[in-house]
Structure formats: structure tokens, C-alpha cells
């Protein structure tokens, strides 16, 4: 397998040999940001709830040969098995087919008879932990029923630094606390269904431009390395790492490392982010898998903490791999210590046992590569058996109910001057805009939803699923109006402005539908290369609104979008009587919307991002042109922790609609704030100390002769195997750089299996256990002061007090139901992490001595209750 994998590793080692101070300037004469090295890669120890699964993993891995361990770590290649990623198998020990990994965070990609769930951003708009869990559970059930072992989701990267970032909709919200809670609940739901969840994309994967070299070159950008996201230590901990800590604390089984570089070290071979932050500090017990083709070196990635290579080949279907045979070679010749591969296998099998795959597992009953019933066993090369590859198993169960419920619960009522809810007595209803109707090519007519035709219920890319059906707004509204004896007139061509004007002038209410789309960078739609070119509405949307508003004084605007759009030119027009953001609601789109429009569901959703007046209101623009010659484009996160509402607050800029805003058909009041310290001597912060045990090894390595290709094996072209062609390791590797001295490419300490010091901020999954001790109890009385029953989302923000801190940061929230006139006392607690800052010198969390305050209300800028926090440490 000819590839200079040692050479790549050497370059990686050299790039991290000397940690340097973060530098924001670039150019041929300027130093770039560097990522400090951290070695060796921590070995899993089965802490806490992982103990039993870890014990079982050790038992089975101890029986494995080196080749069998390697088989678990390496995918067999793109389109070589049924799933988008599938490892080798270990049939001798009962793992009769490889572990199947499959997209996506909102449903099963490349499949059929599955559900299409609301996107992550819609879940964030519900602010509902239970709904997040139930969605995760339902998705997990569907993946399990299709024979999938590893669900490639949910996502908290991108977090949302850029409002126009292409994949922000796959995640939840630019707020780390809101994202972290819903991220964790989704993971719990998926794994309670018996499927391994994957927290992705780790980390700082905030834009699509320049994420992959080949992709960027295809768009005409002359770069040779992927983008580097350059961030300081404080921002990393307090913003971007925060939700991943919640994921690890929730027991996530897998973490997917990202395409981008972090401080000029690739995400899947970055020892600082994988070894130190994820495994040593956060105590992650599961396995790290690469994003597809994000694996850039063999030895370098192995020593830096990567545990699984996906899809196994270097480029799709090239038959080459950094691992597979090469990983077997590297262990046999001592380049990679045996304990490192043992740890990879143990981590994979620990996650496998943790979620119960040994009890629930069935073979994949679908093919990602064809909808035909029969096909080649190995699709990429048309080899193996011609066999049944699709069993057409319907896995939808009754999940349409939770999809519809989340769709309605995530529908944000941004403005309402009394137009909503509709009474059902409207005689003439206009439904205007392409976004109300069907895609003329069919709901799944564009591969990976890579177009913007008809209503937008899902964005584009690998984070998608096939719709089993799609209820459009036009269909649902028409059914509702007709059942009420009314008339409905629809114009769904955005170029038919004169026809829209005619309908609007005759309608008692005009419902206008507009959208804005985005997605993954491998698809460009209308010149949007994944990321959006701007924040304007798509397909003449502004002109559609202008036309209708000028002819109808009761215009309701419904926005389906991946994130914020610019609404400043029309939102305050008196003829715009209501504005709804419906996000990406999935297959029940129209039904969910009608439930809210007609008052069957009282809206309770809150916007999970800020609506600014201009794109400039959000701060730093996307990096859309290379700024480092043909080297890695440098994306400096100079705004630090100040993104979204934190940025608006810092600039004292008033948004159109603030983070957390959302109206209801009733009203709520807040009163009687109470704050009580809970700290005692037993709750004092205790930095973790001590050291690990030595790196364990399991089983014997054997010799090269033990790992020759088995006699009689019919080798599949380009399939990634763990075996050797020859007992001559150099010949088996077929690497032109084989034989380099270790000192040329092995970082210092990378193979040290002796006991290692524990980090002060570590000690358990999620970080130091005392970070999660409750220090303060806060309560407030919430009253439904209106005439309609409904849910309210109380939000608690903290002012951390420091001179360079955000004005407020969200820390707690809930969603509570109140009948008209009913009062409830909402009680929550603040733990040490909620009140702490990351100290870059101490490398630990500290509660500063600056005075702190707590604020409670209905949004980030409607906080009627506030009080000083007692001093706790």
C-alpha cells in the first residue's frame, strides 16, 4: 500500500514540537498558531458507569490477535460494505460482521422506510430536555432496527460562531449551555435504544469553506491544507469544549474528530484536543473515529489519540489505508506500542457493550448504495456475491407523532399583533410562496437534499435522510381551510408576483412562505458552497413579501431557514401581523405548522439564536478567501467567547429579536426570586491529583508470520485488510519512507506507557467531579397571566463579574406547563462549573472573586428578576 504515511507523521510531529503563543497575524514572515503536544495517549480505565462494559471489553480484546484488533479500528473502505462506514469483523469471537456506522443526526441516510426528524436547531428551539431525549430515542430505535451499530450524530460542531455557517442547523445553538444539555439528552436517548451515539464534529468545525483540500480545489481555491481554526485556551474551554464535556458526562460512546485543523494541527491527529482535552481532562472512555477522509497520517494519528479510521481508505475507493496492514506493521516493528492498539480496541468494545450491542445486534438490512433489492456484496468494485442487499424493513413505528410534536414545539412566534391564532372562520386564505409547496422533482428528488425546491424541511449534505413523505404547508393549510368551509388560493411560483398580488388583495389573511438554505460543502446550491453567501432570503423572498404586504393588511410571514435571516426591511411593517420561524421541521412540516396557526398548540418555542439587523451585527465574517498563500487558511477566533447574543451585548447593539425570545397566545409573569447558598466544607473544590496505572496490554503480539493473508482467502479488490503480504515488514508496508529513525517523527513521550500524572481538571467522565457539585439554589415564581394554557421557558443567566466577561451567560432553563392563572415555583441549581472561569495559568476551573449576579426571565434581554449571588468557592 504505497503511501508516505511515515512522512506525514513526521511533518505532524515537527509541527507540534514547539508550542508557541497564539498569534493572530499571517503571512510568509509571520509565525502561525501552534497546538501544544500532549503525549502519551491516555488509556481507558473504565471509570464509574463504564466499569462493567470496560471489564467485558478487556476480556474479549485479551482473546484477540493483533490483526483482529486492527480490523476493529479500520474501515473496510468506501462502498465496500452496506453502511457508509463499516469496520472489519472478528468472527472467531462472535463479531460476525463489522461495526456499521451510518449518518445522520436527523435520520437514517441512504435508506428507505425511515423517518425524517426535525433538525437539531429545531430541538434547540423547543428548549425541552424531554423532547430532545425522545427524539434521540426514536432515532436510535430506527437505526437499531436497520442494523446500525453507530449513529453518526448528534452534532455540537459547528456550535454556531458564524450565523451563515453551512451546517449550523445540524447542531443546536450557538449557546454552549443550551447545546450541551440538549446534546446530552439526545445522546442518552440514542444509547438507551441500544445504539452508539457519536458526538461530532470535534472540534471548531465552524465553516464549510476550506474544510477539505480536494473540495476547495474543486471550487477553484489553490490550497494544500485544510483550514486552521485558531483559538485560545479560555475560549476553547468556556465555549466550544463545554457541550462536549456534557456529552462525555452523559456517557457518549464515540466522538468524531473533524476535518479542520486546530491551531495548525489536524483535528484527527491533534494530541492537544484528543489526548489532553478529550481523554485526559474530560475522561472520555469511548473511541475517537475520524470524519470520512479526515485521517491524514498513520503513526501520527495513532499516537495522537485516534481510535478508528473511517471509512478506512485514504481517498474514497483508492484501496490505500494509513491503517489496516500498515497499523499491523507499525505494531510489529515497534513504531506504535502494542498498548495503544489494545486501547483502541478496548475503547471500541467498551462502547459496544455499554449500549448493549451484544444483546440487540442484527446485521444491516439495507444498502447505502442502491435501492434495488439485489446488488453486489462489495458495491464499489462489483465483487463478492450477487445477493439480497435491501430487505425494505419499515422502521418508522409511530415516530410521526413525536416528529409532529417537536415541529410544533419548535415553531417560534416572533411577532403577533393579534392575527394568530387563526379562528377557522377565515373565508379566503392566501398561501403564497414556493416554500409552501412541493418540490416538483419529489421530496427526495435532489441527492442529499442538495437543492432548494419547494418547502424547506431539511437542509443539505450528509446530515440528511430520505423523506418517507413530506406534508407541505400548502397541503396542510388547504385541508384545514376546506374542512372549515373556507376557500384557499395558492401561488407557489416566486416569479408570479402579479398573481400573488391578485390573491393577496382578495384574501382575509395571506400566509407568505420564504426560506434560506445551506448545507455541507461537497454540494453547492446557487453558488452557496455549503456556507451561505449572505443572510438574505432565497429565491426572491423579499420581493414576495413586499408584493403581498402591499396588497394585504393581514400578512403572516412563515420562515423556514437554517438560521437567522435579515428581516429588517419588513418585520415592522404594520401589514405584517405575525412572523413565524419554523426552522427545518422534518416530514410533518405542514401538520406541525397548522397545529400552531390554528391554536391547537400554543406556541412556546424560543429562538435559539439572535436575529440581527445586518450581517455585520454578528461580528467576524466567514473566511471565504485563502489568507495564507496556498497553505492552511487561518481562521482566528479573535472574538473569544463573544458570539451571538454575547457579541450583541458587548457591542450594546439591540437586535431585532434577541436570543431566547418567543411569544405565546398567553402571557406570563415572573416574581419572587430567591437565591440560597448550598456550599459547605464538603463541597470545596478538590483538584484531581495522583497518577494513572501503567498502560495495560492484552494478549500476545506474535510475529509477522502469524499475520500473513490466510490461505484460500479470495481477496476483494481495494478492500482494506489487516494482514501482511510478506514477513518482510517493509515489503508489506510498501512505504517509500519505511526505515526512518524514530527521532525523526515520533514525538517525545508518545510511546511512554508508564504511569502518567492526572490533570487537575480531570478525574471522571466530563471532568473533575467537584465541578458538578451544586453550590446555589435559585427559585422563581412563574404565573400564567393570560387566558390560554401553555408552556413557558424560564431562563436563568449569570453575570460572572469579570471585566472581560459577557454581560450574561445562559446557565439553566426549563419548559413548564401552566393553566390560566396558575402559578408554579421553578427551582433550579447552579453548580461550580456554572460559576467558574477557565484559568489558563492554573489549567483549572476557578470561581473568581468578582461579584456575580443571577438573572431570570423569558429571554436574554427580558430578565425582570435579578439578585447578587452569594460568594461560593
Curated annotation (Swiss-Prot):
Gene Ontology molecular function: beta-glucosidase activity
Gene that specifies this protein: bglA
Active-site residues (renumbered): 291
Source organism: Aspergillus fumigatus (strain CBS 144.89 / FGSC A1163 / CEA10)
UniProt pathway annotation: Glycan metabolism; cellulose degradation
Lineage: Eukaryota, Fungi, Dikarya, Ascomycota, Pezizomycotina
Function, as annotated: Beta-glucosidases are one of a number of cellulolytic enzymes involved in the degradation of cellulosic biomass. Catalyzes the last step releasing glucose from the inhibitory cellobiose.
Family matches, as Gene3D superfamilies: Glycoside hydrolase family 3 C-terminal domain, Glycoside hydrolase, family 3, N-terminal domain, Immunoglobulins
Keyword Signal: yes
Disordered, as annotated region: 731-764
Alphabetical UniProt keywords: Carbohydrate metabolism, Cellulose degradation, Glycoprotein, Glycosidase, Hydrolase, Polysaccharide degradation, Secreted, Signal
Catalysed reaction equations from the record: Hydrolysis of terminal, non-reducing beta-D-glucosyl residues with release of beta-D-glucose
E.C. no: 3.2.1.21
GO CC aspect terms: extracellular region
Family: Belongs to the glycosyl hydrolase 3 family.
Annotated glycan sites: 71, 222, 263, 326, 333, 365, 453, 534, 553, 575, 679, 725
Top-level EC class: hydrolase
Biological process terms in GO annotation: cellulose catabolic process
Location of the protein in the cell: Secreted
Signal sequence residues: 1-19
Protein name, per record: Probable beta-glucosidase A
Amino acid at each position: 500500500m504505497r503511501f508516505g504515511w511515515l512522512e506525514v507523521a513526521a511533518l505532524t510531529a515537527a509541527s507540534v514540537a514547539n508550542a508557541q503563543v497564539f498569534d493572530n497575524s499571517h503571512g510568509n514572515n509571520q509565525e502561525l498558531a501552534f497546538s501544544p503536544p500532549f503525549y502519551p495517549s491516555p488509556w481507558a480505565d473504565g471509570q464509574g458507569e463504564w466499569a462493567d462494559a470496560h471489564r467485558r471489553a478487556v476480556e474479549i480484546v485479551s482473546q484477540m490477535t493483533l490483526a483482529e484488533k486492527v480490523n476493529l479500528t479500520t474501515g473496510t473502505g468506501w462502498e465496500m460494505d452496506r453502511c457508509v462506514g463499516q469496520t472489519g469483523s472478528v468472527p472467531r469471537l462472535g463479531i460476525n460482521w463489522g461495526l456499521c456506522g451510518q449518518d445522520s443526526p436527523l435520520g437514517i441516510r441512504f435508506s428507505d422506510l425511515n423517518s425524517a426528524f426535525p433538525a437539531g436547531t429545531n430541538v434547540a428551539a423547543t428548549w425541552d430536555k424531554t423532547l430532545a431525549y425522545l427524539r434521540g430515542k426514536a432515532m436510535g430505535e430506527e437505526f437499531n432496527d436497520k442494523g446500525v451499530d453507530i449513529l453518526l450524530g448528534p452534532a455540537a460542531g459547528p456550535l454556531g460562531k458564524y450565523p451563515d455557517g453551512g451546517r449550523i442547523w445540524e447542531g443546536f445553538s450557538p449557546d454552549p449551555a443550551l447545546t450541551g444539555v440538549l446534546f446530552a439528552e439526545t445522546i442518552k436517548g440514542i444509547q438507551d435504544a441500544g445504539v452508539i451515539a457519536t458526538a461530532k464534529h470535534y472540534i471548531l468545525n465552524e465553516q464549510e469553506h476550506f474544510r477539505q483540500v480536494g473540495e476547495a480545489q474543486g471550487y477553484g481555491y489553490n490550497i494544500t491544507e485544510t483550514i486552521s481554526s485558531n483559538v485560545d485556551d479560555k475560549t476553547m474551554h468556556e465555549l466550544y469544549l463545554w457541550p462536549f464535556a456534557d456529552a462525555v458526562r452523559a456517557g457518549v460512546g464515540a466522538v468524531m474528530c473533524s476535518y479542520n485543523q486546530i491551531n495548525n494541527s489536524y483535528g484527527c491527529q491533534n494530541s492537544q484536543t484528543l489526548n489532553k482535552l478529550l481523554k485526559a481532562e474530560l475522561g472520555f472512555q469511548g473511541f475517537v473515529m475520524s470524519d470520512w477522509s479526515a485521517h491524514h497520517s498513520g503513526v501520527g494519528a495513532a499516537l495522537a489519540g485516534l481510535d478508528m479510521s473511517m471509512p478506512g481508505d485514504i481517498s474514497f475507493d483508492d484501496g490505500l489505508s494509513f491503517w489496516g496492514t500498515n497499523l499491523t506493521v507499525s505494531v510489529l516493528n515497534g513504531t506504535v506500542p502494542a498498548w495503544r492498539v489494545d486501547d483502541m480496541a478496548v475503547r471500541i468494545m467498551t462502547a459496544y457493550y455499554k449500549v448493549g450491542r451484544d444483546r440487540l445486534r442484527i446485521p444491516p438490512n439495507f444498502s447505502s448504495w442502491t435501492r434495488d433489492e439485489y446488488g453486489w456484496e462489495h458495491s464499489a468494485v462489483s465483487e463478492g456475491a450477487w445477493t439480497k442487499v435491501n430487505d425494505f424493513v419499515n422502521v418508522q413505528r409511530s415516530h410521526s407523532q413525536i416528529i409532529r410534536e417537536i415541529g410544533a414545539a419548535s415553531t417560534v412566534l416572533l411577532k403577533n399583533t393579534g392575527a394568530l391564532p387563526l379562528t377557522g372562520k377565515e373565508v379566503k386564505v392566501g398561501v403564497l410562496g414556493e416554500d409552501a409547496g412541493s418540490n416538483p422533482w419529489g421530496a427526495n428528488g435532489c441527492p442529499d437534499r442538495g437543492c432548494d425546491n419547494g418547502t424547506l424541511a431539511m437542509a443539505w449534505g450528509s446530515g440528511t435522510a430520505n423523506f418517507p413523505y413530506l406534508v407541505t404547508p400548502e397541503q396542510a393549510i388547504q385541508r384545514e381551510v376546506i374542512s372549515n368551509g373556507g376557500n384557499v388560493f395558492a401561488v407557489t411560483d416566486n416569479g408570479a408576483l402579479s398573481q400573488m398580488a391578485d390573491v393577496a388583495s382578495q384574501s382575509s389573511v395571506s400566509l407568505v412562505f420564504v426560506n434560506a438554505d445551506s448545507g455541507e460543502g461537497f454540494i453547492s446550491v446557487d453558488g452557496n458552497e455549503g456556507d451561505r453567501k449572505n443572510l438574505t432570503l432565497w429565491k426572491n423572498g423579499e420581493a414576495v413579501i413586499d408584493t403581498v404586504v402591499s396588497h394585504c393588511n393581514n400578512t403572516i410571514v412563515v420562515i423556514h431557514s437554517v438560521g437567522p435571516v435579515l428581516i429588517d426591511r419588513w418585520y415592522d411593517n404594520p401589514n405584517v401581523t405575525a412572523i413565524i420561524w419554523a426552522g427545518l421541521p422534518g416530514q410533518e412540516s405542514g401538520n406541525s405548522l397548522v397545529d400552531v396557526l390554528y391554536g391547537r398548540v400554543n406556541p412556546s418555542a424560543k429562538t435559539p439564536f439572535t436575529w440581527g439587523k445586518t450581517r455585520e451585527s454578528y461580528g467576524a465574517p466567514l473566511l471565504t478567501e485563502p489568507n495564507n498563500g496556498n497553505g492552511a487558511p487561518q481562521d482566528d477566533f479573535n472574538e473569544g467567547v463573544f458570539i451571538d447574543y454575547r457579541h450583541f451585548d458587548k457591542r450594546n447593539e439591540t437586535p431585532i429579536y434577541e436570543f431566547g425570545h418567543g411569544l405565546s397566545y398567553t402571557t406570563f409573569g415572573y416574581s419572587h426570586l430567591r437565591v440560597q447558598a448550598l456550599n459547605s466544607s464538603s463541597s470545596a473544590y478538590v483538584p484531581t491529583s495522583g497518577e494513572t496505572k501503567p498502560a495495560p496490554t492484552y494478549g500476545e503480539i506474535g510475529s509477522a508470520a502469524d499475520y500473513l493473508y490466510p490461505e484460500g482467502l479470495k481477496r476483494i479488490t481495494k478492500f482494506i485488510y489487516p494482514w501482511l503480504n510478506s514477513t518482510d515488514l517493509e515489503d508489506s508496508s510498501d512505504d517509500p519512507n519505511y526505515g526512518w529513525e524514530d527521532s525523526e517523527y515520533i514525538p517525545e513521550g508518545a510511546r511512554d506507557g508508564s504511569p502518567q500524572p492526572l490533570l487537575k481538571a480531570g478525574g471522571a467522565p466530563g471532568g473533575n467531579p467537584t465541578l458538578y457539585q451544586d453550590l446555589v439554589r435559585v427559585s422563581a415564581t412563574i404565573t400564567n397571566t393570560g387566558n390560554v394554557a401553555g408552556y413557558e421557558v424560564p431562563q436563568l443567566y449569570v453575570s460572572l463579574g469579570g471585566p472581560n466577561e459577557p454581560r450574561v451567560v445562559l446557565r439553566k432553563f426549563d419548559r413548564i406547563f401552566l393553566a390560566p392563572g396558575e402559578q408554579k415555583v421553578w427551582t433550579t441549581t447552579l453548580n461550580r462549573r456554572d460559576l467558574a472561569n477557565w484559568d489558563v495559568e492554573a489549567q483549572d476551573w476557578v470561581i473568581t472573586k468578582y461579584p456575580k449576579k443571577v438573572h431570570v426571565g423569558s429571554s436574554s434581554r427580558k430578565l425582570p428578576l435579578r439578585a447578587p449571588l452569594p460568594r461560593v468557592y
